[in-house]
Design a protein with these regions (language model features):
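Thiamine diphosphate
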Residues: 1-137, 278, ...
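Conserved beta-strand scaffold positions in the cores of enzyme catalytic domains, especially
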Residues: 53-55, 116, 140, 204, ...
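The start of beta-strands in P-loop NTPase/AAA+ ATPase cores
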Residues: 23-24, 138, 201, 227
Length: 297
């Protein structure tokens, strides 16, 4: 067990899978000689060679297309079974605009056959990546760039897999529930700390994966607190939070003491300007205000 950043946990998990299974390879822009834009694959080409750590041209279509063909032929690229894992660095905090700071997980969550993975902790980043690489289906692994070096925690040294569809209680509480994933887990945590001073106990449920998602854990939290806020960085319309809210309304309506509340990004492209990006991404004060509104019911 050692303390590692979110980025280090991803790197270690990827390296372990490549060491144990020679069919696993990495392909992407600057992943080889340069070690990746964020240095996740630093040193990989020296250890595994240029045939397993492949620098691709600046064409996402070519990368995914190559992965698809390799998977069909029996390899396990990191894209009947098509075992592809597509690593998708995403999320705001770096002023990357609509090209690099978006959270498009909901765009893929409605496509049958794809698995959508959104780790929030270093331990889950490693374990969920191992599960994704060994899964027989295409997996979209959303790693939030803002967490790379910001979050650090104990991570087991040995190889392990974290199961899909099993939510994690990030913080137990009795009065309000926040359902979230990815970097928003920590936004919710900061907001909950402020409400704790008011004597309001907030439960934070980290979904970990959106496809499959842990409906049972969500409903249990709803029945425990009866007041629910769904929080995500994706836009409001069509965001996965709408699916969660609809399921709660269908299956736990009588357990609610207040309408399900959603806090999301607005329905606009992600701005480049840092102040505008901050206004776009849900902030701690937004969550605090939403939770206080719910607590008044």
């Amino acid at each position: 067990m050692a303390e590692k950043t979110y980025l280090q946990a991803i790197s270690d998990g990827l390296r372990e899978e490549m060491r144990r299974d020679k069919r696993v390879f990495v392909i992407g822009e600057d992943v080889g000689v340069y070690g990746g834009a964020f240095k996740v694959t630093l040193g990989f080409q020296e250890e595994f060679g240029a045939w397993r750590v492949i620098d691709a041209p600046l064409s996402e279509t070519a990368i995914v297309g190559g992965c698809t063909g390799a998977a069909i032929m029996g390899m396990r690229p990191a894209g009947t079974p098509v075992p592809i894992t597509i690593r998708l660095p995403s999320g705001g905090g770096f002023s990357g605009g609509p090209f690099h700071s978006q959270n498009p997980e909901s765009s893929f969550a409605h496509i049958p056959g794809l698995k959508v993975i959104c780790p929030a902790t270093p331990e889950d980043a490693k374990g969920l990546l191992a599960s994704a690489i060994q899964d027989p289906n295409p997996c979209l692994y959303f790693e939030h760039k803002h967490l790379y070096r910001r979050i650090k925690a104990e991570v087991p040294d040995e190889r392990y897999e974290t199961p899909f569809g099993k939510a994690r209680v990030h913080q137990a509480g009795d009065d309000l529930s926040v359902i979230t994933w990815g970097a928003m887990v920590y936004t919710a945590e900061e907001a909950a700390q402020q409400l704790d001073g008011d004597g309001v106990s907030v439960e934070i449920l980290d979904l970990r994966t959106l496809v499959p998602w842990d409906k049972q854990a969500v409903l249990e939290s709803v029945r425990k607190t009866s007041k629910v806020l769904v929080l995500h960085e994706d836009t409001h319309t069509g965001g996965f939070g709408g699916e969660i809210a609809a399921t709660i309304a269908e299956e736990a309506f009588e357990d609610l003491d207040a309408p399900v509340k959603r806090i999301t990004a607005p329905d606009t492209p992600v701005p480049f300007s840092p102040p505008l990006e901050k206004a776009f991404i849900p902030q701690v004060e937004d969550v605090v205000a939403g939770l206080r509104d719910l607590s008044e019911y």
